[in-house]
Amino acid sequence: MVVILTAAVTLLLPAPILGAPAQSAPKTVVIDPGHGGGDTGVKGTGGTLEKDVTLRLARLIENRLQGRYRVLLTRNDDYIMPGPDRTGQANHNNADLLISLHTAGSYSPTANDLQVYYYTEAEIRNPDTAASGESKATPWRKVQKPHIPASSILAQRIWERAKGLYANNPGGVVPAPAAVLAGADMPAVLIESGYLTNPKQEKNLNDNKYLFKLASAISQGIDDYFNNPETITSTDLRE
């Protein structure tokens, strides 16, 4: 941890105009492109790497959200970043949302759906969503607990917008002990945006037009969450 000390500076500012409406600060959205550097993530049959897809998608989402929100990326280039550092960036910047981006892999070359995860402490077999022993041992994982209801709503909003791109098998909203979500002190979700091990889906995830549509859908889901953060019932979620 780096502590930065800043000297106090007194500024002479004009007196505020009485009656002028206060301007609220824009919401902060942190986009986390999964993997990076030597941690390549899933590799598609055509050689596409998860780390590259997630970074391209993150930049497109950033572009779609700018102007309405303060948008930060946990990484802006191809380098390794530990999971706790990703969550730490969101916490340090007092983010209102954390969106972690991934792609999936499967032994089945026809697997093709969209999974949007929110945090739970239940076990699940998935390298992107399984919490590490270190994260399970730290009390920081407890900070996500109060945000789980809101995280599930955020996941539902995003999935509702993006599922049309996966018409034959739209997937769903799933609880999982995702390590990157465990210590997030704000609503947070992890998006598995398709299977690179499916040649057709790999082609889609290399297509800029397709990625733009996906980025737009995710951005609309974020807008929907901020505009309508009402509670949804458990029957709306795939357990």
Model-inferred region functions:
Residues 2-14:
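Bacterial N-terminal signal peptides
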Residues 13-15, 32, 186:
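Hydrophobic alpha-helix-in-membranes signature
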Residues 14-24:
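Boundary at the C-terminal end of the N-terminal hydrophobic targeting segment
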Residues 26, 55-239:
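Active-site-proximal helix/loop segments of hydrolytic enzymes
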Residues 27-47:
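Short glycine-rich His-centered loop
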Residues 32, 39, 50, 100-102, ...:
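Acidic active-site catalytic centers that drive phospho-/nucleotidyl reactions
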Residues 44-49, 204-208:
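Short glycine-enriched, charge-decorated loop/helix-capping segments at active-site entrances
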